[in-house]
Amino acid sequence: MATGKIVQIIGAVVDVEFPQSEVPSVYDALNVTDSKERLVLEVQQQLGGGVVRCIVMGSSDGLRRGVEVVNTGAPISVPVGTKTLGRIMNVLGDAIDERGEIGAEEVYSIHREAPSYEEQSNETALLETGVKVIDLVCPFAKGGKIGLFGGAGVGKTVNMMELINNIALQHSGLSVFAGVGERTREGNDFYYEMQEAGVVNVENPEESKVAMVYGQMNEPPGNRLRVALTGLTMAERFRDEGRDVLLFVDNIYRYTLAGTEVSALLGRMPSAVGYQPTLAEEMGVLQERITSTKQGSITSVQAVYVPADDLTDPSPATTFAHLDATVVLNRNIAAMGLYPAIDPLDSTSRQLDPLVVGQDHYDTARGVQQTLQRYKELKDIIAILGMDELSEEDKQVVSRARKIERFLTQPYHVAEVFTGDPGVYVPLKETLRGFKGLLAGEYDDIPEQAFMYCGTIDDAIENAKKL
């Protein structure tokens, strides 16, 4: 084992000098010997003269020059397999739930090659979520990549929690949750909610359905930069066993942000809006590994924070290129009190194709979008001249569009504690039946209030009787 000495410390970036003949490779993990807690450095660059520049996987507080560092000769490796289920781990795969060591028989390096083209699967199957607006307008594919786009406070995490609740329980597959740079409180709430739902079994962790990897907001950038890869590595192991895995990443923007934080310290010139010049490559390395093979599938749902609600920002724009479906959350819809605040006009999916979902579903979804788009165009006229100036046909469009807007809302299981309304899971055929009826004018006589926060169309009819 080669040993070196720390020669420079600048925040999250540390330079280590090794003998010329024993310089570590890029991505090698180095252990700091003097640290009270386990402290790992990951080599990023070889500067010449035996000096390597590293990112600290932890806090560099208290480190000093001259401290000895040992090269492990391999990249960071994390435990994989069933022992990780029901446990909370950090970026290095160490348990942080105070329930003892993970004790896994197998470890994988977090830096792995993406599956080759021959290994990848090309089958298409839909994944029902039970959320009306998603199943109708932007259906998910099994083994696809889904992005939840939204600014601060419009409901990305709540939507993700509901998807975990609906898909993990209905689909009964295994899930890996990677909390990348998000709030510690949300991670804590998630853990206890999963216990209540029976997804995490504290008494017998290996019967759990989810493994959790956290690198929260208060962690140094090295942890936030690599924690997504740690979660993905665990998901890949389950996939290679022939399982269908769900990978939830909250939030992929913080992964980019951590890269931005260390990029300048590594001596790279910033590019547009101050992002790292390697933004597209870093995103590609992560996203290309999230794929389905002939053995099993990884379906990933990623929350994407949109800075200042600007979808053209380089970070969300780079993420867009990799996704099969995009769920866009709109602040204006949230301001109207319509939740989930998913924009049916901005949200897209490659699966919304007559050859995949069928002609009936496709026509219904496009009919809903057409009605809502026409209403959007008429809003200016209504604001200036009022409803009376519209033709009878346009008045009917407005009436139906307002009902559709309200019928797209739905009570969530994970929001029951706030709203007091029990959550509902709406099967796809019920969703289609309701919207087909609305477009055909079958429910023109029902007041629009009846459609607020109901499940199926039958619930709306019941609500109308109470009004």
UniProtKB/Swiss-Prot annotation:
It is found in: Cell inner membrane. It is a peripheral membrane protein. The keyword Nucleotide-binding applies. Its main location: membrane. It comes from the Bacteria. It comes from Vibrio campbellii (strain ATCC BAA-1116). It catalyses: ATP + H2O + 4 H(+)(in) = ADP + phosphate + 5 H(+)(out). GO terms for cellular component: plasma membrane; proton-transporting ATP synthase complex. This is ATP synthase subunit beta 1. InterPro entries: AAA+_ATPase (IPR003593), ATP-synt_VA_C (IPR055190), ATP_synth_F1_bsu (IPR005722), ATPase_a/bsu_AS (IPR020003), ATPase_alpha/beta_chains (IPR050053), ATPase_F1/V1/A1_a/bsu_N (IPR004100), ATPase_F1/V1/A1_a/bsu_N_sf (IPR036121), ATPase_F1/V1/A1_a/bsu_nucl-bd (IPR000194). Pfam families: ATP-synt_ab, ATP-synt_ab_N, ATP-synt_VA_C. SUPFAM superfamilies: C-terminal domain of alpha and beta subunits of F1 ATP synthase, N-terminal domain of alpha and beta subunits of F1 ATP synthase, P-loop containing nucleoside triphosphate hydrolases. PANTHER family: ATP SYNTHASE, ATP SYNTHASE SUBUNIT BETA, MITOCHONDRIAL. Keywords: ATP synthesis, ATP-binding, Cell inner membrane, Cell membrane, CF(1), Hydrogen ion transport, Ion transport, Membrane, Nucleotide-binding, Translocase, Transport. GO terms for molecular function: ATP binding; ATP hydrolysis activity; proton-transporting ATP synthase activity, rotational mechanism. ATP binds at G150, G151, A152, G153, V154, G155, K156, T157. PROSITE patterns: ATPASE_ALPHA_BETA.
